[in-house]
Amino acid sequence: EEFGLRGGLKYAEIAVKENEQHIAAIESDASGYVPRGFGFSGSDEQLNKIQDWLKYFDKNTISYFSKGGGGADIGPLHRQTGTPMFGLSIDGQKYFEMHHTAKDVFELVHARELELGTASLASLVYLIDKYGL
């Protein structure tokens, strides 16, 4: 996204050209802080269905699926193909203390917070696979 969305635009272009079928697109680009929920862009029917998945998540991490979400990198695919998209939402209170600063290095990422985000994303993929959208 930092370079004019070129990667996302090219990916969508190739996906359309090759008639690739996507079940969902998922983006995590808000940092590695504690996950809080997911934003979702798709149909209202799909959103109602995935709201029921909250029971599978610890409410202290993933507590919502909100309408509208995804990310800049997967937006072109969503717009060109209608692929539903998810964006991981995090507790961003400290986001600008590190984002694009000298402290914005992997070594300073809190390992446990990153693990919680990874587990949340893996759980989402599992639920999409098991129950579909």
Spell out what each predicted region is.
Residues 1-50, 73-74:
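Acidic/histidine-rich catalytic neighborhood of metal-dependent amide-processing enzymes
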Residues 33-133:
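Active-site-adjacent substrate-binding region
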